[in-house]
């Protein structure tokens, strides 16, 4: 699946400082590192981009395009910044994101058509985040139909199910996964993405990686097209390339409910097994899930 | 065609815990099925237990109809506790060490511990002891209480994420059971039990997931207790198999609704208590003896 590198994110102190000072160096270092690591897209997350939106996003786009040939994902809630960013990208960019919310349908969505970009569509509506598979389906069918009517085909649309942290709402993890599984049946030809690192938000920092990687493998089994993730996680890139077939097949076996003898596993395999069980919803999550 | 009701059986068990000593000993929990599922297989060896809340100082904010049953003893915690044990058929007394609040009277650990011992010795039922929830003060108070009441087998709490180590150590050293408290979050609940379990026996832990009153978040407590119970009994998660305490009296009686009339107050406490019983609470701390009587009657008839 495609990896959209998430490191250039306005919440990072390094990034926000560099953007504030218009210092290209830290930004370019991150762009180069992600490119070298094997990312397929570079995400530029500006957040709400309230201050000088057009100038800021265009500076960011130009700065990053100086050092990488990868296509960009422009990630902001601000339609003014979004338009300014999309309009100058050298390669066909990804509009990250629009949703079923009224203001987004009216102001964000049409930009994908205007600038001929790929489009991330999330399941959000004016009522917020749908709480289960059924309501996600209902919401996305409506939003995709709206996009289709504007002339945007399914092949250019990447659906985001909105992923919540396992430590906040364990049940939603299963709902998002189930939704991604059903997606190809209800919207043939449609693509997908997801904010992978959300799964581990709130979990102690050193334990976040294995949650991200395991969930990625689980999503991949159902044909996930892309993830917005930490491209600098070597093991994540490696897993995605199929370079760790034992781990991948172990995760699949646990997903299938197979009884696996723990004593036959290495420490790493045991960790992936336990993590899969938590993400499946079979084991109640706690920060100590690897110790039990 | 005759309808045959399905009968479920589960393989998990809620741990049984004993508090109090000798003739006073009280067993809590131990069930191998879901709350009130008498129609399923499995056993419910102990009925729900009820305690009344007693303060170590005269409360100033309680409604007059709440103070009414205790009005002649409310300034003497020992007499108050004795009255609960003697007149109101409690299974246990819950002593709230309200005066140790550093923002209020800031009673010393020594004084609180001495009083606790007097109360424990005066009553013929086991004693539950709650600190005020002040992270630092509770460590001093509960450790001292544990030491001074060595051998009484109290149920002590709250032990929280920020201070459980020291409190658990004192409880273990002096033979008391522990209340592990987390703020309405099942994942944090499990986490605290795992952490505690490293140095304190899981079969001496009671879970307090925090009980919210009707209209003020009761459904959060309800779903949490229900989930914890199901995870333990159905899915055999050892870190959710502890008995549950619902310390709901204070939460209910501080509501605007409970302060409007006696009847409404009793109903507020009663509905909250009944709901949490159905969710899986094994021991409940109430404030009004009439609520306690009402609940026992409901359970008896059911």
Give the role of each language-model region:
Chain B
Residues 61-65, 89-119, 123, 129-136, ...:
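Glycine-rich, proline-tolerant flexible connector loops at the mouths of alpha/beta enzymes
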Residues 104-130, 143-151, 226-246, 301-302:
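Alpha-helix-loop-beta-strand connector modules within alpha/beta enzyme cores
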Residues 162-299:
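Catalytic alpha/beta core domains of metabolic enzymes, predominantly
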Residues 85-88, 117-122, 143-150, 166-174, ...:
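Acidic (Asp/Glu)-rich catalytic clusters
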Residues 46-48, 89-91, 123-127, 150-154, ...:
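Short, well-ordered coil/turn segments that N-cap beta-strands
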């Amino acid at each position: 699946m495609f990896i959209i590198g998430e490191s250039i994110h306005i919440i990072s102190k390094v990034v926000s400082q560099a953007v504030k000072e218009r210092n290209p160096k830290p930004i370019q270092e991150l762009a180069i590192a992600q490119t070298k690591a094997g990312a397929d897209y570079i995400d530029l997350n500006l957040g709400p981009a309230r201050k000088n939106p057009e100038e800021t996003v265009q500076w960011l786009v130009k700065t990053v395009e100086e050092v990488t040939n990868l296509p960009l994902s422009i990630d902001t809630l601000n339609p003014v910044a979004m338009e300014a960013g999309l309009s100058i990208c050298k390669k066909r960019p990804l509009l990250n994101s629009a949703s079923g919310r009224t203001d987004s349908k009216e102001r964000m969505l049409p930009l994908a058509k205007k600038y001929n970009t790929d489009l991330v569509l999330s399941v959000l509506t004016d009522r917020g985040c749908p709480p289960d598979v059924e309501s996600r389906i209902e919401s996305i069918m409506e939003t995709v139909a709206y996009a289709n009517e504007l002339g945007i085909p399914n092949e250019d649309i990447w659906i985001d199910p909105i992923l919540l942290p396992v430590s906040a709402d364990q049940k939603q993890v299963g709902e998002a996964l189930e939704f991604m599984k059903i997606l190809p049946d209800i919207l043939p030809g449609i693509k997908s993405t997801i904010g992978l690192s959300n799964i581990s938000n709130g979990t102690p920092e050193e334990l976040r990686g294995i949650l991200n990687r395991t969930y990625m493998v689980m999503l991949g089994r159902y044909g996930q097209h892309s993830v917005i993730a930490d491209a600098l996680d070597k093991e994540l890139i490696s897993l995605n390339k199929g370079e760790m077939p034992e781990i991948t097949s172990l995760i699949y076996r646990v997903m299938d409910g197979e009884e696996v003898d723990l004593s036959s596993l290495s420490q790493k395999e045991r960790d992936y097994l336990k993590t899969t069980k938590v993400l499946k919803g079979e084991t109640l999550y706690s920060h100590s899930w690897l110790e039990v | 065609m005759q309808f045959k009701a399905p009968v479920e059986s589960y393989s998990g068990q809620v741990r049984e815990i004993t508090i109090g000593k000798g003739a006073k000993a009280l067993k809590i929990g131990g069930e191998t099925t879901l709350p009130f599922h008498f129609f399923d297989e499995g056993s419910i060896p102990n009925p729900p237990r009820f305690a009344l809340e007693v303060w170590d100082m005269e409360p100033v904010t309680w409604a007059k109809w709440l103070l009414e049953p205790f009005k002649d003893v409310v300034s003497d915690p020992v007499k108050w506790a004795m009255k609960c044990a003697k007149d109101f058929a409690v299974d246990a007394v819950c002593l709230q060490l309200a005066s140790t609040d550093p923002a209020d009277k800031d009673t010393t650990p020594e004084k609180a511990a001495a009083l606790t011992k007097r109360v424990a010795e005066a009553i013929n039922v086991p004693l539950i002891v709650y600190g005020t929830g002040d992270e630092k003060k509770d460590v001093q108070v509960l450790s001292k209480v544990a030491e001074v009441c060595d051998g009484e087998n109290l149920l002590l709490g709250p032990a929280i994420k920020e201070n459980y180590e020291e409190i658990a150590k004192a409880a273990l050293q002096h033979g008391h059971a522990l209340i592990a408290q987390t703020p309405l979050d099942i994942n944090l609940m499990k986490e605290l039990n795992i952490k505690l379990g490293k140095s304190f026996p899981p079969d001496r832990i009671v879970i307090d997931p925090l009980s919210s009153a009707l209209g003020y978040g009761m459904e959060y407590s309800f779903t949490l207790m229900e989930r914890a119970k199901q995870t333990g009994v159905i899915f055999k998660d050892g870190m959710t198999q502890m008995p549950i305490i619902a310390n709901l009296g204070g939460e209910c009686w501080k509501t605007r609704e409970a302060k409007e009339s006696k009847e409404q107050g009793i109903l507020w406490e009663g509905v909250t208590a009944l709901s949490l019983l159905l969710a899986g609470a094994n021991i409940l701390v109430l404030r009004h003896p009439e609520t306690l009587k009402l609940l026992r009657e409901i359970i008896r008839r059911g």
